[in-house]
């Protein structure tokens, strides 16, 4: 068995970047719902010398997540987990976004929390949208959604009343992720493990390209021109932060969210009254 296994759930731009940054010397398990994307990422990493295994996973299915976790455990002691699977409001419906980003993330946190090794770490990739698209939703509502079983949350009348379209579904699900991580940090700590989240802003990935093309290009351009860093980020910059959170240097950091947004939240929260 391999001494240390790195699990990447979501093999897209950010997921693969983290796998490459953290994966050397580890057994890497890649998972994604898209077989084509999964195969391409696996082949690229194998060509570059990584030890990679892949398996299809649909995180909106609890059974699929359980099977994926069993596969991870068969490869060796799971020490690092990255949950980067998620759907964009541009290409997905309200229902599918909630099933993946909200319930699916909950399934992953719960199942890998049962087998993570002592000293292990997890990073959930959330989004700046959790701060900007759900700011009007009462925190008590967010807490209730986060603390309802992933198997039951999609049927809550409160969810239907709160989330009216795919954009609010995206923002609410990402804000719920913060509370899911905070709550999980307590149970993970009992196993000697840590869990945190990262909220990227505008990062140059295929998902951002889709959002730019779907009548949101002016928003992305505005952010790139006006945020303090004056540009969009790249997936490697998110991977560097993930490496910190997954490593021993962050041993006193758990249950928190780190923004990697080039200062976008500061820009969006600025005082415009003067």
UniProtKB/Swiss-Prot annotation:
Catalytic residues identified in the record: 170, 174
PANTHER family (UniProt xref): DEHYDROGENASES, SHORT CHAIN, ESTRADIOL 17-BETA-DEHYDROGENASE 8-RELATED
Function: Short-chain dehydrogenase/reductase; part of the gene cluster that mediates the biosynthesis of the diterpene glucoside brassicicene C. In the first step of the brassicicene C biosynthesis, the bifunctional diterpene synthase bsc8 that possesses both prenyl transferase and terpene cyclase activity, converts isopentenyl diphosphate and dimethylallyl diphosphate into geranylgeranyl diphosphate (GGDP) that is further converted into fusicocca-2,10(14)-diene, the first precursor for brassicicene C.
Name by which UniProt lists this protein: Short-chain dehydrogenase/reductase bsc3
Name of a matching Pfam family: adh_short
Gene source species: Alternaria brassicicola
Record InterPro entries: NAD(P)-bd_dom_sf, SDR_fam
EC class: oxidoreductase
Family to which the UniProt record says this protein belongs: Belongs to the short-chain dehydrogenases/reductases (SDR) family.
Keywords, sorted A to Z: NADP, Oxidoreductase
Pathway, per record: Mycotoxin biosynthesis
Binding site residues for NADP(+): 14, 170, 174, 203, 205
Entry EC no(s): 1.-.-.-
MF-aspect GO terms: oxidoreductase activity
């Amino acid at each position: 068995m391999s001494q240390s296994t790195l699990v990447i759930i979501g093999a897209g731009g950010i997921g693969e970047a983290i796998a490459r940054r953290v994966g050397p010397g580890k057994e890497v398990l890649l998972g994604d719902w898209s077989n084509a994307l999964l195969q391409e990422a696996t082949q690229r990493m194998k060509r570059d010398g990584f030890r990679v295994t892949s398996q299809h996973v649909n995180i909106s299915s609890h059974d699929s997540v359980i099977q994926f976790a069993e596969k991870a455990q068969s490869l060796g002691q799971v020490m690092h987990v990255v949950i980067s699977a998620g759907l964009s409001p541009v290409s997905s419906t309200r229902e599918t976004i909630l099933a993946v980003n909200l319930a699916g993330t909950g399934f992953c946190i719960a199942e890998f929390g049962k087998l993570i090794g002592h000293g292990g770490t997890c990073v959930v990739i959330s989004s700046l949208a959790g701060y900007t698209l759900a700011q009007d939703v009462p925190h008590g509502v967010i807490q209730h959604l986060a603390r309802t079983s992933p198997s039951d949350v999609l049927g809550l009348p409160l969810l239907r009343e709160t989330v009216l379209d795919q954009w609010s579904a995206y923002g609410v699900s990402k804000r719920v992720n913060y509370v899911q991580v905070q709550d999980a940090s307590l149970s993970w700590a009992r196993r000697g493990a840590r869990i945190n989240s990262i909220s990227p802003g505008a990062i140059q990935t295929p998902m951002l390209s889709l959002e730019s093309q779907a009548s949101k290009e002016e928003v992305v351009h505005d952010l790139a021109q006006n945020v303090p860093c004056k540009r969009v980020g790249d997936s490697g910059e998110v991977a560097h932060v993930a490496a910190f959170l997954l490593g021993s240097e962050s041993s006193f950091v758990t249950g928190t969210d780190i923004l990697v947004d080039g200062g976008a939240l500061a820009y969006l929260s600025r005082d415009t009254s003067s």
